[in-house]
């Protein structure tokens, strides 16, 4: 749960998992510990579908934004990291909300495990696999909710 020194006031927070073709979006409350997948936004080349993202923002009215910081498992830089940081800066400029970066190592593995569990229980089908990006965003957001002080602020 966010502490007094968190960059966000209490309220709704959106989390993002940035990929080369899609951006997963999740929602959570700064007062709680859970998050849920809500959307997958298409990326065309390097252009984000901002109209779709604007609708998500209008629907949820977040007080802050959490973007996954895609380091390698060893903690090194990788090409997608530059895109994720650029997206985080674009979010801050466009929405004038606080944005933080959260280490997303292994979030895709955890998301795949959650999806497999939901599929085995009959809640998801193979065609729902594109929701994996949104599930990964929920994992990232839950990490921030559990420990907001581990986040990195944008420069």
From Swiss-Prot:
Database matches in InterPro entries: RNaseH-like_sf, YqgF, YqgF/RNaseH-like_dom, YqgF/RNaseH-like_dom_sf
Primary residence: cytoplasm
SUPFAM superfamilies attached to this UniProt entry: Ribonuclease H-like (SSF53098)
Any one cellular-component term (Gene Ontology): cytosol
Keyword Nuclease attributed: yes
Keyword annotations: Cytoplasm, Hydrolase, Nuclease, Ribosome biogenesis
CDD domains membership: YqgF
Subcellular location: Cytoplasm
Transmembrane segment boundaries: none
Protein's GO biological process: rRNA 5'-end processing
UniProt GO molecular function: nuclease activity
EC number from the UniProt entry: 3.1.-.-
SMART domains, A to Z: YqgFc (SM00732)
Function: Could be a nuclease involved in processing of the 5'-end of pre-16S rRNA.
NCBIfam families: RNAse_H_YqgF
Protein family (similarity comment): Belongs to the YqgF nuclease family.
PANTHER family the UniProt entry points to: POLYNUCLEOTIDYL TRANSFERASE, RIBONUCLEASE H-LIKE SUPERFAMILY PROTEIN
Protein name: Putative pre-16S rRNA nuclease
Organism placement in taxonomy: Bacteria, Pseudomonadati, Pseudomonadota, Gammaproteobacteria, Lysobacterales
